[in-house]
């Protein structure tokens, strides 16, 4: 089966709308991947200037270092965009970003010596940031993604050691 038959099959099974779930540990470059994917495949397919600017504004932030940047699952762009995968295969794509599973040494989830408590749409009460991140990541993997893409790292993109990522990668896979 050549690759375009695979794409045609996915299009038929999903009614032409693909949700690409980008998952993995925190601080691996998930949001950076989404921004780059959008730069190469989504933004060039938008002809309406206003829609293109809105879509740029919807892209996630990214940065170097150990601080967790993403704080909740996010669908990017807000509205699916048509992308040609071959001469005769066109699908509508949205990416789904998530916080990811916690990695030892990452920062941003602890404040004044205790784990931050956050409000989520899943509970009526506050829960620990790490728990919310895990639930959101699971929801992206199990409930939203048509295709899942696991992002890992060798540790060179942050100041975190490679071995710190392994438990979170195992949870993801």
Label each region the model flagged.
Residues 1-129, 139-151:
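Conserved G1/Walker A P-loop phosphate-binding module
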Residues 131-173:
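Conserved catalytic-core segment of NTP-binding enzymes
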């Amino acid at each position: 089966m050549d690759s375009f038959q695979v794409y045609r099959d996915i299009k038929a099974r999903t009614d032409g709308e693909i949700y690409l779930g980008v998952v993995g540990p925190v601080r691996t470059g998930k949001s950076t991947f989404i921004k780059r994917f959008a730069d190469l495949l989504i933004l060039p397919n938008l002809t309406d200037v206003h829609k293109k600017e809105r879509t740029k504004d919807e892209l996630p932030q990214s940065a170097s270092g150990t601080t967790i940047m993403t704080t909740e699952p996010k669908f990017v762009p807000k509205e699916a965009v048509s992308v040609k995968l071959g001469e005769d295969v066109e699908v509508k794509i949205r990416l789904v970003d998530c916080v990811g599973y916690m990695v030892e040494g990452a920062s941003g989830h602890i404040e004044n010596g205790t784990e931050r408590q956050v409000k989520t749409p899943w509970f009526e009460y506050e829960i620990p940031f790490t728990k919310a991140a895990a639930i959101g990541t699971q929801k992206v993997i199990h409930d939203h993604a048509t295709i899942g893409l696991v992002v890992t790292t060798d540790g060179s993109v942050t100041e975190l050691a490679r071995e710190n990522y392994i438990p979170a990668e195992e949870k993801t896979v």
